[in-house]
């Protein structure tokens, strides 16, 4: 019986990586930095993808589906709408950033296809799929788990729009039930503290996490009173954004 193979790709953000699923089982996963020796390498994972194919003794055309971890067009929409919401503030940065966004977000599908065709110039473009960011997080948590049914909680900086989500996992299906959207993000607040104490955003958060047990929560009340508004239902919004309106 023919195996169903799914190639997962994460790239162009931080810690680019690939994984291979065969008949529902993860048989390979690696980060590009292991091959490029560039910490948190965000480039398309060419080297790790080639190793994936070599290790599993398969060709790219033997893969049934290729899935990218987010939907770039929706992220591009958020970037544009966010700048327009605060216009004319930041117009110079907006105009200088637009060419980069057009290349990295709006035309990312073409970039991914071009990269895959470097390995196999006959790559079938119809095999390429895009999953919403939080759906990818939920899937990576639920499907490898021992549970047939579960509530799935996801919280990060931001995906396309969602920063926090709750989903229901039921056998082979996942349904997002509730989302909190950008700019309301505990993850971005955490990144702000990461930057404040001198670490790099999207890199040093784990260091802050490692330091946390050695400290005392003497500023927790100050943070709750001045930086974030926590509602009775558990939802939240940063109070510090209001002065930008």
Model-derived segments and their meaning:
Residues 12-41, 174-180:
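Short glycine-rich, Thr/Ser-proximal phosphate-binding strand/loop in the N-terminal lobe
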Residues 144-188:
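Active-site cavity-forming subdomains of large catalytic enzyme subunits
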Residues 2, 130-152:
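Conserved phosphate-binding catalytic cores of ATP/NTP-utilizing and phosphoryl-transfer enzymes
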Residues 3-21, 153-168:
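Gly/Thr-rich phosphate-binding beta-strand-loop-beta motif of the actin/hexokinase/Hsp70
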Residues 242-243:
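Conserved small/polar residues in nucleotide/adenosyl-binding loops
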């Amino acid at each position: 019986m023919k195996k169903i193979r799914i190639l997962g790709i994460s790239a162009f953000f931080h810690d680019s990586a690939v994984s291979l699923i065969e008949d529902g089982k993860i048989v390979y996963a690696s980060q590009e930095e292991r091959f490029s020796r560039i910490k948190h390498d965000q480039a398309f994972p060419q080297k790790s993808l080639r190793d994936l194919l070599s290790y599993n003794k398969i060709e790219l055309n033997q893969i049934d589906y290729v899935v990218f971890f987010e939907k770039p067009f929706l992220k591009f929409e958020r970037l544009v709408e966010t700048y327009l919401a605060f216009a004319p503030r930041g117009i110079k940065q907006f105009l200088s950033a637009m060419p980069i966004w057009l290349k990295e977000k709006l035309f990312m599908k073409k970039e991914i296809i071009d990269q895959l065709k470097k390995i196999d110039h006959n790559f079938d473009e119809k095999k390429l799929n895009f999953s919403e960011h939080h759906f990818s997080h939920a899937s990576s948590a639920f499907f490898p788990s021992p549970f047939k049914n579960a509530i799935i909680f996801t919280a990060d900086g931001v995906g396309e729009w969602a920063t926090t989500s709750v989903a229901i996992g039921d056998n082979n299906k996942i349904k997002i039930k509730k989302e909190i959207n950008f700019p309301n993000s505990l993850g971005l607040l955490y990144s702000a503290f990461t930057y404040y104490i001198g670490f790099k955003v999207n890199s040093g958060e784990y260091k802050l996490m490692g330091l946390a047990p050695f400290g005392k929560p003497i500023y927790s009340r100050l943070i709750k009173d001045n930086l974030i508004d926590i509602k009775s239902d558990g939802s939240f919004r940063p109070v510090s954004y209001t002065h930008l309106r």
